[in-house]
Amino acid sequence: DCCHNTQLPFIYKTCPEGCNL
């Protein structure tokens, strides 16, 4: 998922609006 940080799954990366998993 583009919103999940691969190192810390509970932390969200910056990604385009609409990707808010």
From Swiss-Prot:
Q: Which residues cross the membrane?
A: none
Q: Where in or outside the cell?
A: Secreted; Target cell membrane
Known tissue expression: Expressed by the venom gland.
Q: What does UniProt say on post-translational modification here?
A: Contains 4 disulfide bonds.
Q: Name one GO cellular component term.
A: membrane
Record keywords = Disulfide bond, Membrane, Secreted, Target cell membrane, Target membrane, Toxin
Q: Name one GO molecular function term.
A: toxin activity
Q: What does this protein do?
A: Has hemolytic activity under low-lecithin conditions. Has low cytotoxic activity. Inhibits the expression of VEGF and bFGF in human non-small-cell lung cancer cell line NCI-H1299 in a dose-dependent manner.
Q: Any other noteworthy remark?
A: Is classified as a P-type cytotoxin, since homologs have a proline residue at position 31.
What's the family? Belongs to the three-finger toxin family. Short-chain subfamily. Orphan group XV sub-subfamily.
Q: What is this protein called?
A: Cardiotoxin-like basic polypeptide ah
